[in-house]
Amino acid sequence: MCTFCPIPTEQQPLNEYQILNNSVLFNWPSQKLKIYFFYLFTIYSIGFLLTFLITFYNDLFIVHPVNIFVHGIIGGNFVLILDLLRLYLGWSYICQRLLSATVSYEESGWYDGQIWVKSSEVLIQDRLIGIYQVRPVLNRLKQTLGVVILILGFTLLIQ
């Protein structure tokens, strides 16, 4: 990252970005659209099936068979919203650390927080990555979250 950087390597913003981008649970919003939609569908399907099975085994199928599917849609959307929020919070934390001119860190874990001012070279590099790599992921997550919340709201209205 730089010749003199007092931050431990795992707390450096660029390394945090690379770790997050290589993580299986966090990298799929930065993938191609086809892979992104596949994972969205997978998460939604898991939530739908769990909710569907729970409502099915509560004997609601006999009384209100259509409500099982509506509850499944609500459950799938709810699980998807929780996952998208988790992803958004993780990526926005990394974006904030990349775009910031100062970085707070702890050397020993004894709550002795320090602040390091980035050099201009490191700041330019981090901001370029934040603007051109992380912000598009955040925008994609925001748009997806908005659409899923609209679908959930519409489903709740028709129920």
Swiss-Prot record:
What coarse category fits the chief subcellular location reported for this protein?
plastid
Please tell me whether the keyword Plastid is annotated for this protein.
yes
The cross-references to InterPro entries, in alphabetical order and at most eight, read: CGLD27-like
Kindly list the GO CC terms recorded for this protein: cyanelle
Alphabetic keyword roster: Cyanelle, Plastid
Q: Does the keyword Iron apply?
A: no
Give a Pfam family name. CGLD27-like
Q: Where in the cell is it found?
A: Plastid, Cyanelle
Per the record, the similarity remark reads: Belongs to the ycf36 family.
Question: What name has this protein been given in UniProt?
Answer: Uncharacterized protein ycf36
